[in-house]
Amino acid sequence: QRQMCIRDRVYVAPNSRFDKELTGGEDRYYHLVLLAENNKGYENLMKIVSRGFTEGYYYKPRVDMELLQEYHEGIIALSACLAGEVQRYIQKGLVDEAKKAALKYQDCFGKGNYFLELQDHGLPEQKLVNTTLLQMSRELDIPMVVTNDVHYTYADDVKPHDILLCLQTGKKLSDEDRMRYEGGQYYVKSEEEMKGLFPYAWEAVENTQRIADRCHVEIEFGVTKLPKFDVPEGYNCLLYTSP
């Protein structure tokens, strides 16, 4: 058995996961990070992701609050990047809506299981969002955590990653209007680097390790866990599965 920290970034539909039509100006989905705190959380995470694919697929496999409430047990949630629901509202100047969204997620996952996520990749909009998140954390008593959005391992991987991004999206490096990750800060940063970015949020820095320490998922390897199907009397496996 090996202890792991298993997580997934899910896409949360603005309303129901079954809705395939959007009203004017509405986002298709919001990002949300889910971590399995224990084996029950791992089971619930698999159910959330699976039903997002089978029931909520619209551009992305989307989930909704109904699913999150049904399978919240054993899961720690982070508010994600600038594409998270709380952050989206802040960027639009809708701070009251951002507060409502944060409380909605805290009510869903439980106090101490939902964290407002601070990131700093040198983007101007992150400075504004982080300032507001700090105020919201104090006002609403919702804990914070610092993270770095990672898309490549080392700092000098930025150029190869940009080339791969062009291959993926069918663009050229010389194209101005294309997807790119500006600033070269999307790599795995050291503890010292992260502390240097957030000298004003020591509690949030320490929460990064506290969350990791809480995650205890144990997966047993080397054991086949396929479901067993009994063959009806009078059949063998080959005969029963033949067309």
Predicted regions mapped to residue ranges:
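Phosphodiester-processing cores and adjacent nucleic acid-binding clamps
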Residues: 3, 7-242
